[in-house]
Amino acid sequence: MIALIQRVSEAAVRVDGEVVGEIDTGLLVLLGVEKDDDEAKAKRLMERVTTYRVFEDDEGKMNLNVKQVNGKVLVVSQFTLPADTKKGTRAGFSRGAHPADAERLYDYFSDLCEQELPTERGRFAADMKVSLINDGPVTFWLQV
């Protein structure tokens, strides 16, 4: 399971022109679910995402996590993250989970996040338009 996390000052996701999720200070989490992922991996990744220190302390060091800054999380499904891009000029998607499994684990991950801090989410498998202001920019690839 993969989370591409971005520290944002704001982020929103729209479906058919309607805002379905929106946050101010926090993390935009693009979530990719792989074939062998399960609830244990989702829980471990949620713990990493919500405790990963990407926000600056009083000394300017990235020493604080999203919970410590009273931030929020916006979780957006991103089926292209597990893609195989090692060869050629077209990505292969065989490493991604079956859509039904991916949706179940995406919902599970998002539900776990909601238990920890304010969480918004995109709409699984929808054509989404994601806007953000990346603060830094600060972006990390987390994988379990």
From Swiss-Prot:
A motif (Gly-cisPro motif, important for rejection of L-amino acids) lies at residues 136-137. It catalyses: glycyl-tRNA(Ala) + H2O = tRNA(Ala) + glycine + H(+); a D-aminoacyl-tRNA + H2O = a tRNA + a D-alpha-amino acid + H(+). GO terms for cellular component: cytoplasm. Its EC number is 3.1.1.96. Keywords: Cytoplasm, Hydrolase, RNA-binding, tRNA-binding. It comes from the Bacteria. GO terms for biological process: D-amino acid catabolic process. SUPFAM superfamilies: DTD-like. One of its GO terms (molecular function) is Gly-tRNA(Ala) deacylase activity. Pfam families: Tyr_Deacylase. It is an enzyme of class 3 (hydrolase). The keyword RNA-binding applies. The keyword tRNA-binding applies. It is found in: Cytoplasm. Homodimer. An aminoacyl-tRNA editing enzyme that deacylates mischarged D-aminoacyl-tRNAs. Also deacylates mischarged glycyl-tRNA(Ala), protecting cells against glycine mischarging by AlaRS. Acts via tRNA-based rather than protein-based catalysis; rejects L-amino acids rather than detecting D-amino acids in the active site. By recycling D-aminoacyl-tRNA to D-amino acids and free tRNA molecules, this enzyme counteracts the toxicity associated with the formation of D-aminoacyl-tRNA entities in vivo and helps enforce protein L-homochirality. PANTHER family: D-AMINOACYL-TRNA DEACYLASE 1 (PTHR10472:SF5), D-TYROSYL-TRNA TYR DEACYLASE (PTHR10472). Belongs to the DTD family. A Gly-cisPro motif from one monomer fits into the active site of the other monomer to allow specific chiral rejection of L-amino acids. This is D-aminoacyl-tRNA deacylase. It comes from Vibrio parahaemolyticus serotype O3:K6 (strain RIMD 2210633).
